[in-house]
Amino acid sequence: MEMRNLSRRLLDQPKRAKALLQLALVISITLVTQAEETKIPRSYERFEILAAGGEKDSRDPSWKPSEGIPMEVSGMEWIEDKLAVCIRKGEIWMLENPLSADRNKINFKLFASGLHEPLGLLKDGMDLLVAQRGEVTRLRDSNNNGEADAYLTECDGWNVSGNYHAYAYGPARDGNGNLWVSLNLGMGKLANNHIGWRGWAGTISKDGSFQPKALGMRSPSGMGANLKGDLFFSDQQGTWIPATPIYHLRPGVFYGNQESLASLKSPEAPFEMKVIPKPNQDYGEALTSSERFVPPAVWLPYNKMGRSATDVQVIDQDGKFGPFDGQLLIGEFTNSAVNRVFLEEVDGQYQGACFPFLNHFPAAVLRLQFAPDGSLFVGMSNRGWSSLGNRSYGLQRITFNQKTPFVIKEMKAQPDGFELVFTEPLHPDSLTPESLKVSSFTYQYSSRYGGDEINPARHKISGIKTSMGGRSVRFKVENLRTNYVFELTTQGLRSKLGQRLKHPQAWYTLNRIPSD
């Protein structure tokens, strides 16, 4: 019996060997395929110039500030080959050799001090304009010794109080050369928002006066122009604002926060509002009820895309920062990140999509500034609030290493659906009817702090077609509805080179449906 079984095993060995070889080949192919699908090369390199020395949260009882400059970056601007950096404690430092790969060769020189929580810098000739709480100040170095010797009031005329939340931002220049300033609302019982243009944005006139232009803001902490020169600003989720919006800034409009309405009673108010939108209704319904109420160009859904947007910076680097020229980068405070926004015009109004971009910064991202070489400086400060970073402040430089990430570059509205444009061609086998899922939701217009996603719906997808050599995917979406956010979730998409899609989700704010 044993001899017969042994003979049978010996006779079966070639078959077993062949089967084992086939199994090994299958496993090998599977592992290679999985490796190809999951391989995501790094496209951006980070260089830390300065950060808080402690690894602990700044709210930790044992936290102590690091030695040296507390680089709580609140504004950045280039003056020739130097980077001017203002910090929250009221100083402006000039960084010499800021593009050096050796941080020991980057020198810091104090340019100005004694400012009241400056939150923006802008070059004007060889002067610097800085927004502090009570005014926009012109800083001038008359004798070229590297220090400001003239502090000149460029503009004032808004209410200033001791409320901690009463910030002023800017100035920012639009395509027509106008200088804009935006003003925070105060918070709490001592908010003092009833006078002095709190929650407004305005321009600086030639005589230095503040000209209020638009209202309805809560915390408009970042402003930046696109390639056309149209100005955009970020606001932050809170009272009357259910999630983070990115707005097109222009005169004569209302952005939703009714705590700013008090200044309409001023004799200097530039316009009146005949109808004030009623609260506790769908956002789209509220928009149609008032002639001046306008929607965000893009909503950044709460938590999914962050919680508190900060700076707005257009990418205009001739490809030196990747294939995203013309799009906007948005700083994110709480999630310590930088997000990306694609915009398009439909019927003369801006709308578009938002995407994750860079994350895992060591502190809250507050300011963004491109360098002449196409790299991006990221300025950070927690300011006592919380962020996902484990430091309290810092400054980093981000460079593109010429390895294009495989991501959704654009999401465009179509009369019957959407078009996706990718940075690399899709692998044809990875696109199936199950690859794309679309849902939508809106928000309630309400005075309460923040808001939930309401009226959710899932949408049937059909007619998936590719073009542009696999870089474009167009598909129909059933029951498109305006003033809703459309959430796209992708599954299993990979490029022809086998790269897995880096960010599988996108959110499009559909204010208007294009006619063709």
Give residue ranges: language-model regions.
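Short, surface-exposed alpha-helix to beta-strand junction/turn motifs within ectodomains of secreted
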Residues: 421-463, 488-497, 504-508
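Bacterial N-terminal signal peptides
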Residues: 18-30
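Beta-propeller domains with acidic blade repeats across secreted/periplasmic ectodomains
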Residues: 36-405, 409-417, 428
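Surface-exposed, short loops/turns at beta-strand junctions within beta-sandwich domains
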Residues: 479-483
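Sec/Tat signal peptide C-region and signal peptidase I cleavage site
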Residues: 31-35
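N-terminal secretory signal peptides that target proteins for export/translocation
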Residues: 1-16
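Short beta-strand elements
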Residues: 502-516
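Blade-terminus and WD-like Trp-Asp/Gly-His loop motifs, strongest in beta-propeller folds
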Residues: 466-469
